[in-house]
UniProtKB/Swiss-Prot annotation:
Record-stated family: Belongs to the Fmt family.
InterPro entries given in the database record: Fmt, Formyl_trans_C, Formyl_transf_N, Formyl_transf_N_sf, Formyl_transferase-like_C_sf, Met-tRNA-FMT_C, Met-tRNA-FMT_N
PANTHER family, sorted: METHIONYL-TRNA FORMYLTRANSFERASE, METHIONYL-TRNA FORMYLTRANSFERASE, MITOCHONDRIAL
Protein name: Methionyl-tRNA formyltransferase
The organism of origin for this protein: Sulfurovum sp. (strain NBC37-1)
Binding site for (6S)-5,6,7,8-tetrahydrofolate: 110-113
């Protein structure tokens, strides 16, 4: 027997799950819905979502509505007579009219009810969590509030950053998708405990600003904001190759404690960091030592 699937998703995470469904012999994906093409980069080149590119490679029909309530969308989904609608990082809330067509299964990259919303993976790193995971759930009208079906947990290594964690959770989500569909008839959905629920918002560029107050908070921002927005000081200087040295000591915020080859050790009001790379606003990337030498900064001075 083949499961008839309609798939909704947009970014790379969702693309990998679609790839898994396409490769599975017992899954038949007949229709894909994804976000409209968007302008990307400085030149604003109109770019299709990763899910659309993959679907077209496999000859699967693609719809890109601005809203799922648009005319003809519900009818297009219904006409496929799906067994399941599978949703992963789609970017729109499903209206009840679509939720009623078939069981809608969402793959959410957190251990629900923790971190409902747009940035669960970043949030787990920001909070320095020891573990995270992926949850498959039955969708309802609320945001990530539906009954849970299955979970895979993952223990986060202390030095792991966003890209590596996202890669791990994507692999787990692919496995979980197949497991949940295949075992759906025997799974007892479990209601989420509302007293344990938390929400996470979309990341903004300003979230990456740091102030050398708390080394552990800065290090967790460095882990969570890999790629974008990164971490940067109020004057726009960006920091990379950051290591948490200690979290209990007390220093003057931003004080240069010492140099270690091409890196600089910087004190925070709580704790200390080792920084390997700096990039002043609108300037080239350079080693931390080169930055300090070029500005005549020595031990005891403020890094900025």
């Amino acid at each position: 027997m083949k499961y008839k699937i309609i798939y909704m998703g947009t970014p790379h995470y969702a693309r990998e799950i679609l790839q898994t469904l396409v490769e599975a012999e017992d899954m038949d994906v007949s229709l894909v819905l994804t976000q409209p093409d968007r302008p990307v980069g400085r030149k604003k080149v109109l770019t299709p979502p990763p899910v659309k590119v993959l679907a077209q490679e496999h000859g699967i029909d693609v719809l890109q509505p601005n809203r799922l309530s648009e005319e003809g969308i519900k009818e297009a989904i219904k006409s496929q007579n799906p067994d399941f609608i599978i949703v992963a990082a789609f970017g729109q809330i499903l209206p009840q009219s679509i939720l009623d067509i078939a069981p809608c299964i969402n793959l959410h990259a957190s251990l629900l009810p923790q971190y409902r919303g747009a940035s669960p993976v970043q949030q787990s790193l920001l909070n320095g969590d020891e573990k995270t995971g992926v949850t498959s759930m039955l969708m309802e009208a609320g945001l990530d509030t539906g009954p849970m079906l299955e979970k895979i947990e993952f223990v986060i290594p202390k030095e792991m950053r966003l890209f590596a964690l996202m890669e791990q959770l994507t692999r787990d989500a692919c496995m979980l998708t197949l497991s949940t569909v295949r075992n759906f008839e025997t799974i007892t959905p479990e209601a989420q405990d509302e007293s344990q629920a938390s929400l996470c918002k979309k990341i903004k560029k300003s979230d990456g600003q740091i102030d050398f107050e708390d080394a552990e908070i800065i290090y967790n921002k460095y882990r969570a904001f890999e790629g974008w927005p990164g971490i940067f000081a109020v004057n726009g200087t960006k920091f990379d190759e950051v290591i948490l040295l200690e979290s209990g000591t007390t220093h003057t915020a931003g004080e240069i404690l010492s140099f270690d080859e091409e890196s600089v050790l910087v004190g925070c009001s709580r704790g200390a960091l080792k920084i390997g790379i700096l990039q002043p606003a609108s300037k080239k990337v350079m080693t931390a030592r080169a930055y300090c030498v070029g500005r005549g900064k020595k031990v005891g001075d403020n890094i900025l």
